């Protein structure tokens, strides 16, 4: 009986070890693997220019000022590159609500139209924060995809008055 048990254990160990050895992925080139992210676009905040990065560690911090003169200003010059994770600290120095939204130019136009149809709708999503006067909000963003990025305030009339900032990564 003991011999049979030892034989079963030895065979199980041999088969398990051989199977585990065949599952070695250390030599796989993961960077060359095609990955279809197109289905991820349905996730809140997903964009052609990147995605929300809650919980990620930012490698850059950008202080943003939203003002009633309809400007989006970065407090300091900053170079954002593809794959950067950026923490945006967004301050509204004005007396009216403003929005800070990240996306492509096409996405911003769609967002603007949605805001126009819904009236003065305030909301926060993975790619957008609405900031009350005198308040500050943060947005953590991972840049990837299209390298032409547009920041905008899509509250009706604001972008049309100049509250848009475009950059190229």
From Swiss-Prot:
GO terms for cellular component: periplasmic space. Induction: Induced by copper via the HTH-type transcriptional regulator CueR under aerobic and anaerobic conditions. Expressed under both aerobic and microaerobic conditions, the amount increasing with increasing copper concentration. Nevertheless, under low copper stress, expression is much lower under aerobiosis than under microaerobiosis. Cu(2+) binds at residues 98, 153, 158, 163. Involved in copper tolerance. Mediates copper tolerance in aerobiosis. May also mediate tolerance under anaerobiosis. Not required for virulence or colonization in the mouse model. The keyword Signal applies. Disruption phenotype: Mutant shows decreased copper tolerance under aerobic growth. Keywords: Copper, Metal-binding, Periplasm, Signal. This is Copper-resistant cuproprotein CopI. Gene3D superfamilies: Cupredoxins - blue copper proteins (2.60.40.420). The keyword DNA damage does not apply. GO terms for molecular function: metal ion binding. It comes from Vibrio cholerae serotype O1 (strain ATCC 39315 / El Tor Inaba N16961). Residues 1-20 form the signal peptide. It is found in: Periplasm. Restores the copper-resistant phenotype in the R.gelatinosus deletion mutant under anaerobiosis. It comes from the Bacteria. Belongs to the CopI family.
